């Protein structure tokens, strides 16, 4: 199976980030505009976390908070698990499966340069990633 970097090349460029002081509402607007399910959280150029659709569901909606009054810094996932572009896709899929996550930051030399994302359909990530990665083996 190929490397994380191989799959990210197929996916194309692009990551988006917000600051901890951004409201959840503003972050959701950006996610809808860009049709993405997660945002990196950046504090003065330093990667400090990730905000995902699940964070919104579990930490805002189910807690009775409002998206316009809640800041990303209050609910983001701090110190999320990450992978390297040089990691094998098998490792990436295993981490995502074992941790029940769909978005995982890809970190190289301390910098986050991408987010690897699993499709929402159960099992589709393995099939799609294996099909694409086999081209690089």
Model features per residue range: what roles?
Residues 15-16, 38-39, 48, 73-74, ...:
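Structural motif
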Residues 5, 9-39, 43-48:
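A positional/architectural concept
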Residues 1, 28-29, 43-45, 63-65, ...:
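Short hydrophobic/aromatic-rich motifs at helix boundaries and adjacent loops
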Residues 14-17, 46-47, 62, 82, ...:
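Short, flexible active-site loop motifs that bind/organize anionic cofactors or intermediates
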Residues 17-35, 82-100, 107:
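The conserved cystathionine-beta-synthase
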Residues 31-34, 39-55, 96, 104-120:
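A glycine-centered beta-loop-beta connector
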Residues 1-13, 52-82, 88-97, 117-137:
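Tandem CBS (Bateman) regulatory domains
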């Amino acid at each position: 199976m190929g490397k994380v970097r191989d799959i990210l090349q197929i996916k194309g460029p692009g990551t988006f980030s917000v600051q901890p002081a951004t409201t959840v509402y503003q972050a959701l607007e950006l996610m809808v505009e860009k049709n993405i399910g997660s945002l990196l959280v950046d504090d003065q150029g330093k990667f400090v976390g990730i905000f995902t659709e699940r964070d919104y569901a579990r930490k805002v909606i189910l807690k009775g908070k409002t998206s316009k009054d809640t800041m990303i810094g209050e609910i983001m996932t701090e110190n999320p698990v990450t992978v390297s572009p040089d990691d094998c896709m098998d490792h990436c899929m295993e981490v995502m499966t074992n941790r029940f996550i769909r978005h995982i930051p890809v970190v190289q030399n301390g910098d986050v340069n991408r987010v690897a994302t699993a499709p929402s359909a159960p099992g589709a990530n393995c099939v799609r990633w294996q099909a694409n990665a086999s081209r690089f083996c």
